[in-house]
């Protein structure tokens, strides 16, 4: 098994960018991380892209269209609030397993207005109708309460 090192990281400033596409935002972040590592997309053997809001839109491949298509495999990940972390984990595991030596992991999202944005039916649903539902804050809150009940975990 191989040691795994993070060679470069970066991120764009948080904000709303209605005039930009998700791949354009992701491409900027990817290029900044590659620059931080002193590498280019041509050095990469694979790419792992985390995006939930447009998970069916091949965001990773569209990022490569902007920064340079090299023929490398692209894995698109969607895993709710852990999407970016999942892309990083998959990239890390591919190196640890000895499949690749150098890969790129990128996470990108463009949030809509409100809790559910435009993807999940958000507008017009009162807060009271969302509580106790499958929204991710509720899921995590319920998991925390269950852990507290089973193991005596406290807020401290």
Predicted feature locations:
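Short alpha-helical segments and helix-capping/turn motifs at coil-helix boundaries
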Residues: 87-92, 143-144
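Short conserved active-site loop signatures built around small residues
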Residues: 84
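Short, high-confidence coil segments that cap the C-terminus of an alpha-helix
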Residues: 44, 99-103
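Conserved "HGTGT" condensation-loop signature of ketosynthase/thiolase-family condensing enzymes
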Residues: 1-74, 108-156
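Alpha-helix C-terminal capping segments
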Residues: 66, 90-99
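Blade-loop segments of beta-propeller domains
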Residues: 77-80
């Amino acid at each position: 098994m191989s040691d795994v090192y993070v060679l470069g990281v970066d991120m764009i400033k948080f904000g709303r960018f209605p005039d930009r596409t998700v791949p354009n935002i992701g491409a900027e972040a990817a290029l900044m991380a590659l620059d931080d590592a002193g590498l280019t997309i041509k050095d990469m053997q694979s790419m792992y892209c985390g995006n939930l809001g447009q998970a069916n839109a091949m965001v990773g491949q569209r990022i490569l269209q902007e920064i340079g298509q090299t023929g490398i495999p692209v894995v698109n990940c969607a895993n709710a609030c852990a999407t970016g972390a999942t892309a990083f984990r998959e990239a890390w595991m591919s190196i640890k397993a000895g499949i690749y030596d150098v890969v790129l992991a990128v996470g990108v999202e463009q949030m809509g207005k409100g809790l559910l944005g435009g993807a999940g039916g958000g507008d017009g649903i009162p807060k009271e109708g969302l509580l106790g539902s499958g929204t991710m804050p509720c899921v995590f809150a319920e998991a925390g309460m269950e852990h507290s009940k089973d193991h005596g975990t406290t807020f401290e």
